Amino acid sequence: SITTNKIYFGADTLPAQHNGSVSVTGLYAKKDFRIGGLHLNHRVLLQFSSAQEVVPVPLASVYLSYFYEFNVVKGVLRLQIGLDGRYNTKYAGFGYNPAIGQFYNRREYDEDGKLLEVGGYPFIDLFAAAKWKRMRIFVKMQHLNDDLIGGRNYFSVAHYPLTKRFLKVGFPW
């Protein structure tokens, strides 16, 4: 998409207007494989912003879901067990100002003058889901890889870490 004279919140968290056009170009690919009860679902988004300081986007975002699905009791109880994974390449990302309740285009640098970035960290969930007649139940260990890969450098927004590992149980029907 192409926008002109885009209004955004700058690094100082004040409204700013970009003079000129900003283009965000993306390419989305989806490919699912099924081999018997094994499901391999893939989603990839490649994107480019002509003005990262105005519209920061990661170069690539990937979502993978690998699970095995089978009948425990045919026609009555069906079960899925698998992993979900999400990954974004590193990019400048956004900051959040709670005083104004607004995300802003953050530009922060470390002591060496290197731009502080978010992303570059895989987020993996382990899940089991069952369908019994009309009722569904799921158990999910979100952020399974917490503290296992890359220390604790997992942020989606600057200074706001992603959730730690936790167990989630649900009964939708």
Describe each model-derived feature in a short phrase.
Residues S1-W173:
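Exposed, low-structure sequence patches enriched in small/polar residues
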